């Protein structure tokens, strides 16, 4: 089921986000890129703030701007597979859905080298049988900013501040300038409250979770 809003994980209020002295780890994830307008600016901001993120890229965008994806990986962020064509995998046969993911995986391997490119299916939807056929983990989210819908920095910030807590995986899209504005403001603010921004793989490792192929992770 596609999650929305604060998701089904533990919801943190603004009051609960006060610094307790212990680091709080969050994974910001960005779908549907790369975008030549937005992704480089986002990467500049992440570098300045010392924050890491995970980018679930779409193959049909990767072929247009491969240098941006190479930069994402070179700067220590995690690159994931968001399919090649961003089709609703439920509208495809299982063979077609898996072939679309495999096409993007092959592209990423050619561009970045061999590695485990974790999967986020478009719209977060995939059958159990399709997931079980994968050799990598799947990643969904516990906080949905709905940035693609609102395109409003204030509303995006509100969701992040109300809903994000230790161990959350936040869904965003690096195709909107308002998202970049909101994210960089949020990172700077939350870092002052003890938040550390890491990749999904790092988040699971920090929380002592060993990722398994075919399993879906929404938070840590």
Regions found by a protein language model. Give the residues of each.
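Catalytic domains of cell-wall/extracellular-matrix polysaccharide-remodeling enzymes
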Residues: 41, 63, 87-215
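Short, solvent-exposed mixed-charge patches
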Residues: 219-220
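C-terminal motif of bacterial Sec signal peptides marking the signal peptidase cleavage site
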Residues: 3-5
């Amino acid at each position: 089921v596609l999650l929305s809003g604060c998701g089904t994980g533990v919801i943190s209020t603004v009051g609960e986000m006060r610094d307790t002295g212990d680091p709080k780890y969050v994974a910001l994830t960005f779908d549907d890129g790369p975008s030549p307008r937005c992704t480089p600016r986002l990467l500049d901001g992440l570098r300045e703030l010392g924050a890491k993120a995970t980018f679930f890229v779409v193959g049909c965008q990767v072929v247009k701007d491969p240098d941006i994806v190479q930069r994402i990986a070179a700067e220590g962020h995690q690159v994931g597979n968001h399919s090649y064509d961003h089709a609703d995998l439920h509208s495809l046969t299982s063979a077609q859905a898996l072939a679309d993911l495999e096409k993007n995986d092959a592209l990423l391997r050619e561009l970045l080298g061999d590695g485990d490119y974790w999967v986020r299916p478009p719209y977060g939807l995939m059958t159990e049988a399709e997931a079980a056929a994968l050799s990598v983990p799947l990643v969904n989210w516990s906080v949905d900013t709905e940035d693609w819908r609102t395109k409003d920095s204030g509303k995006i910030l509100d969701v992040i501040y109300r809903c994000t807590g230790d161990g959350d995986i936040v869904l965003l899209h690096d195709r909107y300038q308002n998202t970049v504005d909101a994210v960089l403001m949020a990172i700077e603010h939350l870092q002052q409250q003890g938040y550390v921004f890491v990749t999904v793989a790092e988040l699971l490792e920090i929380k002592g979770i060993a990722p398994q192929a075919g399993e879906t992770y929404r938070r840590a």
